Amino acid sequence: MDFRKFLTYDYYLRKEIAFLNRIHSDQAIFAEARRRYYWTTSKKLNYRHPKDISEKVMWLTRYDRDPLKTRCADKYLVRDYVASKGLEDILIPMIGVWDHASDIDFASLPDKFVLKCNHGSGWNVICTDKSALDIEEAREKLEMWLGMKYGVDMQEIQYFDIPPKIIGEEFMPFLGGDVVDYKFHCSRGKVHSCFVAYDRSTVDPHQVCYDHYDIDWNRTDDIKEKFRPNRRLLPKPQRYEDMLKIASKLSEDFPYVRVDLYNCGDKVFFGELTFTPFSGIQSFYKQPMLDELGRFVSLEGIKKHRR
């Protein structure tokens, strides 16, 4: 890479972003997205003719402003969407919903539970023993998260207009172990393949292992080596065929969405619908799979948002 050329392009993007921010232009968000993409991939983001999956997800973030995406990025309202598809049985049971952390009566909660903010990702309090929980610290975290606007730094627009809430869910036994996340790449009801993440229980976050399986559960070699430490062959999930049907049904209304599920024994549980995996840039994939997923996703017929 020509580092001088790289820094020159970054300099002009910074100037453009500063100008657009001064005139409060929506375009500032996407100038920043171009800069972030360039820093991550060393390539210019092709909005005019997007080809690979990262380019197409970034294009969809800019131009596809379907309000259903905001509804389904909301960890509270997405439950209604899942239920509307006849899949209420895969939802983790709720124990409450609150507008403020001060509204939560911890004495009434079970010994094990999960509290999470609905308008972002990673804002969770996982309690496995209420007697050991620092309640005031938990309240402070939740209240802080409620006041934050998720996705601004990564231009994930689907999160911007979600009314912040705290939701409580039952603690599921599989959350305490080495859970495997099954994440299905989908488009308009079609399922392409399954991205998996496991070994999340390790202390070192760099030891989390990513892998990729085709729709027939054959492991592929499409993940870059550094993202798959301690790689091992995973058995086909017990309810895999049902998971494919669920992913198909939940993706019917979207040009691209990643449907995240869990399989615990004979039960399938809903995780979330993800419209911008890894903030839109799936750099752990080798280029051939990025291109293949890009061909899988069609942008035809999408009315481009203009502002």
Task: Specify the residue positions occupied by each region the protein language model found.
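A long amphipathic alpha-helix within ATP-dependent nucleotide-binding catalytic cores
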Residues: 160-165, 208-268
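A short, polar/proline- and glycine-enriched secondary-structure boundary/capping micro-motif
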Residues: 126-127, 203-212, 280-284
